[in-house]
Each structure stands twice: as C-alpha cells, then as structure tokens.
A protein has these predicted regions:
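Extracytoplasmic small-molecule ligand-binding "clamshell" domains
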Residues: 34-104, 174
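Alpha-to-beta junction loops
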Residues: 76-78, 94-103, 145-146, 177, ...
Length: 240
C-alpha cells in the first residue's frame, strides 16, 4: 500500500474492462508462509465503479475488489465483501459488522477521529460533471443551479468548503449513490454533479458524448483503507 496509483490509470483500466493488482515480484527463494489471519469482512458501496460495483452477472468487481482480494491472499485470510449504506460506513465499521472500509474511501481529518487509515494508495480529485450540451463552463456558473453529490461522500465536504460556491447554489442535492445522481443529471433534474474523478472518468468514457468534465474541480484528496482505531494489528498487515 506504499505507492500511490494514478487515478487516470484506474479509470482507463476500468473503462477497458481490465483490472488487477499487479504482478507479484519473483522471489529468489521460497517465502515463508504468512501467519494465518482471521477472515476479513470488507465494507463497500457496490455502486461505485470502477472501484467496486456489480457486473452483468451481478458479481462484485472493481479495482478495490481486486486489491482487497490480493491482500487477503498474501495475508492468508478469507476476504468477504459486504455492501453497506455508505452514509453509515463508520457505524458499520465501529459496530464490528465489517472489519475494513475499502472502496474509494477518502482520508479526511474528520474521519481520522473514528477511523485508522493506511498509507494513501491513490490520489483523487472531486470533479464537476455536466451534460455535454450544458452551458456551464466553470465553477462560478454553478450559481443558482442544482448541484448533486453522494450523501456521506467527501464531495459534500469539498463543496461546503468552497463557501462562495456553496452559498450561491439553488440546492445541494444529496443522493444515496452516484449512479442515481447521474441518472438525474441525464434526466435534467440536476445541473451538475460533483463526484470522485475515478467514477466521473469511468462514466464519461463509457458514455462518450453524453457527459463533459469541467476544467475546474473541488480539490485533490487521497484514498486509503480504513480499520477500527484499535485494530492496529490488521492495519499493520494491510499497510505492508
């Protein structure tokens, strides 16, 4: 988990339906078997492509799914995935219904109060997506508009930090997931959507000609894997 991964690499891989954790390094001598680890339950939002989502066969797939699965193999632990209400992710984690949060989880100072994070593994931006034929060209032109965000996501905080823009909006509309928000954008019920770049680039590549990404954005952030604050042993293993 030490090296950050390019957000554009993730988006391009997903758009091309290619995913993976990378090639293992060959060892000159057989490595010692890892100490057995307990099963790890991963909490995720299963409507968050390309990091975690369901394919046409309803199987969970995605970049973070592959990373967590590979981590489990290296730890000798069985990994199971549990879709959760992302707005209640901290309650799910600290209520011990899941062991880790691993699905495009942004590291923030507020979340650090309740979550122990790994070293960042991916740099992300909060981008602005509009319809391709929209007259909106920049952030200032969001004034008087309905702007969508996923409830409980870092997009909410990113928009609220920009007080001038936040106060100028007609409405900051919150959705349970980005897929629903994009449907409202396509239907004209939203003027724009603030979303993680990995998600935005995935959909703009998938639906070329329907969406457009503005040059301005709402800032850069880092993704990390989250465990309970007292679960330092598991954190240390994942963070190797």
């Amino acid at each position: 988990m030490k090296k950050q991964i390019s957000v554009l690499v993730v988006a391009l891989m997903a758009a091309a339906m290619i995913s993976g954790c990378g090639k293992k390094e060959e060892a000159s001598a057989p490595a010692a078997a890892p100490a057995p680890a307990a099963a790890i339950v991963v909490g995720l939002d299963d409507n968050f492509p390309p990091m975690g989502f369901r394919d046409e066969k309803n199987a969970l797939v995605g970049f973070d799914i592959d990373l967590a699965t590979e981590a489990g193999k290296r730890l000798g632990a069985e990994v199971t995935f549990k879709p959760i209400d992302w707005n209640a992710k901290e309650a799910e984690l600290n209520g011990k219904r899941v062991d880790v949060l691993w699905n495009g989880l942004t590291i923030t100072e507020e979340r650090k109060a309740n979550i122990l994070f790994t070293t960042p593994y991916l740099e992300n931006r909060q981008i602005i997506v509009v319809l391709d034929n929209s007259a909106i060209k920049n952030k200032a032109e969001l004034a008087g508009k309905v702007l969508g965000v996923q409830d409980g996501s870092s997009a909410v905080e990113a928009v609220q930090k920009d007080e001038a823009i936040a106060k100028s909006l007609k409405e900051l509309k919150k959705f349970p997931d980005n897929v629903t928000a994009l449907m409202d954008l396509s239907a004209g019920r939203l003027d724009a959507l603030v979303v993680d770049e990995v998600v935005g680039r995935y959909y703009t590549a998938k639906k070329s000609g329907e969406y457009r990404v503005l040059e301005e954005n709402f800032g850069t952030e880092d993704y990390g894997v989250g465990t309970r604050k007292d679960d330092t042993e598991l954190m240390g293993k994942i963070d190797k």
